[in-house]
UniProtKB/Swiss-Prot annotation:
Name of the top EC class for this enzyme: transferase
Family: Belongs to the UMP kinase family.
Pathway of action: Pyrimidine metabolism; CTP biosynthesis via de novo pathway; UDP from UMP (UMPK route): step 1/1
UniProt signal peptide: none
Name recorded for this polypeptide: Uridylate kinase
Annotated EC: 2.7.4.22
UniProt function note: Catalyzes the reversible phosphorylation of UMP to UDP.
Subunit-level organization: Homohexamer.
Positions that bind UMP: G43, D65, F113, Q114, P115, G116, Q117, S118, T119
GO CC, one annotated term: cytoplasm
Catalysed conversion reaction: UMP + ATP = UDP + ADP
Amino acid sequence: MKLTLKVSGKFFDEENSENLSLLRDVIIDLVNNGHRVAVVTGGGGTARRYISMGRKLNLNESHLDILGILVSRLNAQLLLFSLDNIAYPKVPESIEDFNERWASGKVVITGGFQPGQSTAGVAALVSEIINADYLVLATNVNGVYTKDPQKFVDAKLLPKLTVSELKTILEGSQSVNAGKYELLDPLAIKIVERSKIKVLVINFKDLNKLPNILKGNEILGSVVVPE
């Protein structure tokens, strides 16, 4: 299979840093089992701190986005170093860069590309260009819920849903401000929709179960299916 793994920037926050070795080991396991893997890293708390400081300096949204992009690329570089020779040795800075490096046959790890675009949008673009079998979103919730599970105790996990159903759930919760992107931003959803990309949403703490999920040996998270 060809997989795009979108890793929440929270994975790289200090309190979750012990999970980085898990992430590295899962990627190695996937490669050893014959999968081709692209990874997109978010910026996490470090990006939000820089964006917050930038706002206090009255920076515009494009400049704030660039700060977030630079942090996401630093996270990508950290993961890249940990994978040694199975990963392409440089972090791409555009979709064209990514495409050239994907041709190497190695794992390619990237952060953000340009202002106004979330790393979820980057992950959707990457999935489209490699014709991924799955876009895997490793985030801080257990899947897609009927509403925000961190705010509503009666939120219900949806094991399977369509892109249209996902759009309805996310409608009204999207923000285009730097550092405020939701699970999938509008651009990411459009790309997923037009290219009929299958999306798997799981908690990043369950990432070690991904190989079994892909084999059909375990059911976890939410699958967003094309229409």
